[in-house]
Amino acid sequence: MADIALLWDSKLLFEKFFIEHGFDHQLIHPANMGSPFLPPFKMILIPTGFANPKYSNILPSLMKNKRRIESFITKGGTLLVFGALTDSHFYEWLPVDLEYSQVYGPAELHEKCQSNASLLASDPVQECDGFFCTNGGECILVNEKEEAVLVTQQFGEGMIVATTIHEFPNPEFIRWALDNSTSTAI
């Protein structure tokens, strides 16, 4: 049974990354969320560019499934979401206050708060596609301008991890997140 639901509307390199590191995953179109035929998952991963129609058309489905996403997190699932890849984006489909601003380039990262979520960044210098202007959670990593690039928010029994780091997550982070999540329906 798959541990990770990769929400997207076409094939992605993330699938190769998961296979290379031994993570069980399933590519799910967000329009299929709530289907009784989907297995439970420990993590939902939403890649960079989800709000940009050049890369994906999943944003309307995310908006429509706001309650399902909230329920998944509340019951112990982990949501890992990357940058919107638009000039700005309010994550209205999440149960937390989160606003994104796009600025692409390398960033020197510093830990603002101690958290195992910082495992996501394998190196202190990472490509980032922006920062979070507002966040209702805990700021874990910031860039050299003290702008948030990795934030977390406990919600119910689960967690939201939002990042603007524009690289694959460190496999250690995925293992940590899966070990600390509960399988639940989306």
What are these regions (language model features)?
Residues 11, 16-21, 105-181, 185-186:
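Catalytic beta-strand/loop cores that center a nucleophilic Ser/Cys/Thr
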Residues 24-28, 46-47, 63-65, 99-102, ...:
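Short, low-complexity, polar/charged sequence segments that are solvent-exposed and flexible
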